[in-house]
Design a protein with these regions (language model features):
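Short hydrophobic alpha-helical segments enriched in small aliphatic residues
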Residues: 14-17
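Short, Lys/Arg-enriched N-terminal segments with co-localized hydrophobic residues
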Residues: 40-58
């Protein structure tokens, strides 16, 4: 027996069924609804399938520490990281950024509690930038950093002190651990200044920050994370050019050039809620504020989610393309926080960074939904095509009449 969730949205019915196969059998449904079009969405076959966190999965997983300033997109990135069997999250270090450090730590614990992963430790890091005054981003993320959802704090465990010491000890004891930095680079700069020897064992540094050709999001030229603490960003980039232990490595810069391509829309949130009511409602509650901000500031229907792309890239480098170059960060004047990328090698300096400039939103969103919700990839791809997520620069074709609609049901049609 078929179960349908049917609702009216802008004079258009959307029908959710249990699998793509059933969609193929439903061309006659359109005749039952006059003066409207139908879009058909397959539901998850195994709602909210939990990853098995027992056994030897950690042996093959990439060991990472996530350094973040948990606002809305950081939390989505944490969801992705903690639901990905490819990653073994050794700990979460918190830095001041979107919200003050203590609030960011509370938000990280809320995610861990939601996923029943309070075994992952949370550490308090720096509470102010290296030099300049601290300016938060609560205008973007809400007073609590989670869209003013004001979820209750976690009481079972509390954040630990000394994020820098945790980073140093972990990198010294376990070779090949990577850092995914989703906030200002203050903690990472302090680590470099205080414990440079531990960096020899660093795996990768993937940072969400900066931009190459894209405009800024807090000034005409600067992205917030690097603008919040430009001195720290400069320390980190210069270290990868000058420190002997880091000169053979590069910073992977996931900047606004690629993250602006990743837009979470109301349709996608609705679909996620169908996959898991609990997780979907959590995402809906924390992103409402974000939706309003993006509409008022940039005319975007939905919200740009920067940080999850950095996590996805750390798992699968093929999700983004780019080039290697020397990069530095401006620390004064009207271009404060700007990443200066020497793409044409004018300065003949060591290429200290890998600048990502291209991504595929369709592939990313498939990755995001399948990992967080345990959804079947073929079903997710079918849904994304119907709700017009861009696929490598092409917009998915939507039917204009009955004949086109039947053709769509026969297969995935892209024109």
């Amino acid at each position: 027996m078929l179960y349908f969730l049917l609702h009216l949205y802008n004079r258009q019915f959307e029908i959710y069924v249990s699998s793509v196969g059933l969609v193929r059998e439903l061309p006659s449904i359109k005749n039952q609804v006059s003066q409207s079009r139908i879009r058909v969405f397959p539901l998850l076959r195994e709602p909210m399938r939990k990853k098995n966190r027992k056994g030897d999965w950690r042996m093959n997983a990439k060991k990472v520490i996530i350094d973040c300033d948990p606002g809305i997109d950081d939390v989505l990135a944490l969801l992705l990281a903690l639901r990905s069997p490819e990653l073994d999250v050794l700990g979460i270090t918190v830095v001041c950024g979107n919200v003050p450090t203590t609030q960011g730590a509370e938000n990280a614990l809320k995610v861990l509690a939601l996923l029943e992963r309070l075994d992952v430790p949370v550490y308090l890091g720096e509470t102010k930038p290296l030099v300049r005054p601290y300016v938060d981003a609560t205008d973007t993320h809400g007073a609590d950093g989670l869209g003013e959802s004001f979820l209750p704090n976690v009481t079972q465990v509390r954040p630990k002190e000394c994020a820098i010491e945790f980073l140093a000890q972990t990198l010294s004891e376990q070779k090949g651990v990577s850092i995914i930095a989703l906030g200002p680079l203050t903690n990472i700069a302090r680590l470099i200044q205080d414990y440079p020897a531990c960096l020899e064992g660093l795996g990768e540094l993937v940072t969400m920050g900066g931009s190459y050709k894209s405009h800024g999001n807090c000034s005409p030229v600067a992205e917030y994370n690097y603008w919040c603490d430009p001195d720290a960003a400069k320390v980190v980039y210069e270290a990868f050019e000058s420190y002997p232990t880091l000169r053979q490595k590069q910073i992977h810069m996931i900047g606004l050039d690629v993250t602006r391509e990743i837009v979470l829309t109301p349709n996608l949130v609705e679909y996620m809620t169908c996959l898991s009511e609990e997780m979907g409602n959590f995402i809906r509650n924390i992103t409402r504020f974000y939706f309003d901000f993006h509409w008022k500031q940039e005319g975007v229907i939905g919200c740009v989610i920067n940080d999850p792309l950095a996590v996805a890239y750390c798992i699968d480098h093929s999700l983004c393309k780019g080039f290697s170059a020397y990069t530095t960060v401006e620390t004064a004047g009207i271009s404060l926080g700007q990443t200066v990328v020497d793409a044409h090698d004018f300065w003949k300096k060591e290429k200290n960074s890998h600048i990502l400039t291209e991504t595929d939103p369709y592939r990313f969103m498939t990755f995001f939904i399948t990992h967080i919700f345990g959804a079947d990839a073929s079903d997710v791809r079918y849904v994304l095509r119907q709700i017009m997520v861009e696929d490598a620069g092409k917009r998915v074709w939507m039917p204009k009449d009955e004949e086109d609609y039947v053709e769509m049901l026969k297969g995935d049609v892209v024109k």
